[in-house]
C-alpha cells in the first residue's frame, strides 16, 4: 500500500459507477468504482475490503484519456478519472442499491 492513502482509505474510492455494462458485471460478482487517479491496486483492494467488509480476489484498473471541454472561447480538460473493476470472492456482495419498501 502506498504512503499517500495509508491514513485515509476512504479517500481512495470516490463513487460506484452505475452503467449498463457495470450492472451486467454484478451478476458475476464484479463491481465498478471511480477511484482516485493516484491510487494503486493494493490501495483499492485495502479500501474495498475495509469499507465493505468483503474479500477481494482481483482488480482491473483503467485510466481513460482526459476529454477536452469547451465553454465559449475557453477550452480545458475534464478531471482525471480512474476506473476500477473489483472481483469479489464467492458469497460476498456489496449493497449498492437501498432496499425499496414500497
Swiss-Prot record:
Entry's Gene Ontology molecular function annotations: rRNA binding; structural constituent of ribosome
Presence of keyword Ribonucleoprotein: yes
PROSITE patterns: RIBOSOMAL_L23 (PS00050)
UniProt key word Lyase: no
Gene Ontology BP, a term: translation
Pfam families assigned: Ribosomal_L23 (PF00276)
Cellular component per GO, a single term: ribosome
Keywords: Ribonucleoprotein, Ribosomal protein, RNA-binding, rRNA-binding
HAMAP family associated with the record: Ribosomal_uL23_B
Family per similarity comment: Belongs to the universal ribosomal protein uL23 family.
Quaternary structure and interacting proteins, as annotated: Part of the 50S ribosomal subunit. Contacts protein L29, and trigger factor when it is bound to the ribosome.
Function recorded in the entry: One of the early assembly proteins it binds 23S rRNA. One of the proteins that surrounds the polypeptide exit tunnel on the outside of the ribosome. Forms the main docking site for trigger factor binding to the ribosome.
Name the record gives this protein: Large ribosomal subunit protein uL23
Organism annotation: Prochlorococcus marinus (strain SARG / CCMP1375 / SS120)
Amino acid at each position: 500500500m502506498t504512503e499517500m492513502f495509508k491514513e485515509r482509505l476512504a479517500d481512495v474510492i470516490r463513487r460506484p459507477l452505475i452503467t449498463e455494462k457495470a450492472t451486467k458485471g454484478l451478476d458475476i460478482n464484479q463491481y465498478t468504482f471511480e477511484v482516485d487517479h493516484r491510487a494503486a491496486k493494493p490501495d483499492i483492494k485495502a479500501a474495498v475490503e475495509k469499507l465493505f467488509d468483503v474479500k477481494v480476489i482481483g482488480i482491473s484498473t483503467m485510466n481513460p484519456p482526459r476529454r477536452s471541454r469547451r465553454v465559449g472561447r475557453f477550452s480545458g480538460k475534464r478531471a482525471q478519472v480512474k476506473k476500477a473493476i473489483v472481483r469479489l470472492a464467492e458469497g460476498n456482495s456489496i449493497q449498492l442499491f437501498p432496499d425499496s419498501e414500497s
